[in-house]
UniProtKB/Swiss-Prot annotation:
Transmembrane segments: none annotated. It comes from Cutibacterium acnes (strain DSM 16379 / KPA171202) (Propionibacterium acnes). SUPFAM superfamilies: NagB/RpiA/CoA transferase-like. Belongs to the glucosamine/galactosamine-6-phosphate isomerase family. NagB subfamily. Its EC number is 3.5.99.6. CDD domains: GlcN6P_deaminase (cd01399). This is Glucosamine-6-phosphate deaminase. PANTHER family: GLUCOSAMINE-6-PHOSPHATE ISOMERASE. GO terms for molecular function: glucosamine-6-phosphate deaminase activity; identical protein binding.
């Protein structure tokens, strides 16, 4: 893993966007894996700024979302399809036909999950997968005890995850209990992964993912087995990393060198 610790959320987004754009720029038919939530928002706005400045071209970019609530249609503003439409498709000027989200309204959810896996494979896989991390260590909606080799499937959300996501719903609205999510095995198939962490409430989870044992109790820890992972965190999220000073030192000594990202 390469770990970069930043002073604030804006710096996280700028650095992530720069590294992501470089990888996508090298790909013949670029594919980006996109996440929802508040964490990647500065990354998306920074990617849009790079495009506006002529430093990146996303004309032919294809995108696959990590997950979707079951029971919310794509035109429901609370759905992840709507979130991705606003934060990614419109902001980056993508062709809506090139942006895919899991189908949480399918009559046959198992078939829809299999079809989503096939669509990713037919796109020749994901060049860069953007991830946030939940306070309980989940990535996508892979909650603790998820199989480390899991594929796209239906999952039940943990109560903590529902409570964390309640801020995206109006007061009194019920947060869905079920979702379709890419599995940990699906995520691990991406050629590069960028894990973003912002805020002190993510500190324990990030420490477990980066420095803890690989365990289904911290799903993000499976990323320790991935050959090309870039972790970008702000000071607060990195506050419980025992190797934080080492990560800062290596970053200061890197110069023009970097990993696959």
């Amino acid at each position: 893993m390469e770990v970069i610790i930043c002073s604030d959320e804006q710096a996280v987004g700028r650095i992530a966007a720069d590294r992501i754009a470089k990888v996508l720029g090298r790909a013949k038919a670029p594919v980006l894996g996109v996440a929802t939530g508040s964490t990647p928002l500065t990354t998306y706005s920074s990617l849009a700024a790079l495009a506006a400045e002529g430093k990146a071209d996303f004309t032919d970019l294809r995108a696959f979302a990590l997950d979707e609530y079951i029971g919310l249609p794509a035109d429901d503003e609370r759905s992840y399809a709507a979130t991705i439409r606003h934060t990614v498709t419109e902001q980056l000027g993508l062709d809506p036909a090139n942006v895919h989200t899991p189908d949480g309204m399918a009559d046959d959810l198992d078939a829809a999950c299999a079809a989503y896996e096939t669509a990713i494979q037919e796109a020749d896989g994901v060049d860069v997968q953007i991830l946030g991390i939940g306070a309980n260590g989940h990535i996508g909606f892979n909650e603790p005890t998820s199989s480390l080799s899991s594929r796209t499937r239906v999952k039940t959300l943990a109560e903590r995850t529902k409570a964390d996501n309640a801020r995206f719903f109006e007061e009194g609205e019920k947060v869905p209990s079920h979702c379709v999510t890419q599995g940990l095995g699906t995520i691990m198939d991406a050629r590069n992964v960028v894990l973003l962490a912002i805020g002190a409430n993510k500190a324990d989870a990030l420490a477990g993912a980066v420095e803890g044992p690989v365990s289904a109790m911290c799903p993000a820890s499976v990323l320790q087995f991935h050959p090309h992972v870039l972790v970008i965190a702000d000071d607060a999220a990195a506050s419980k990393l025992t190797m934080a000073e080492y990560f800062r030192w290596t970053d200061s000594q890197r110069g023009d060198l970097s990993g696959a990202m």
